[in-house]
């Protein structure tokens, strides 16, 4: 009996449409490489039905499977563009620490809670 998830079945169209679009792009990359569903599924170590679900944009497929598929298709770098950090966070990462702040990753004696 297939698993069901109330939260996955109630996805808003604003969420479902990008997943479907992503699935179609994955399929296009697979077809461009002239791989059959069976060949790609074997490379992904999943069933052909699971690959079809991924290519259909089904929300229940694993994000790990998606990452593996992107890697196989030479598209793993595109995953870096998903949910980029807000500009404020990126700017804070570029700020250098002063000597008074201490080295990154070092907890001052007074800040330790153990």
Regions found by a protein language model. Name each.
Residues 43, 69, 82-86:
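Short acidic/histidine-centered micro-motifs embedded in hydrophobic/aromatic stretches
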Residues 34-52:
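Short alpha-helical DNA-recognition segment
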Residues 24-39, 100-104:
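Short basic helix-loop element that most often maps to the first helix and adjoining turn
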Residues 57-71:
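Short, basic-rich loop-to-helix N-cap that marks the start of a DNA-contacting helix
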Residues 1-18, 79-82, 86-114:
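N-terminal flexible/basic segments that precede or flank functional cores
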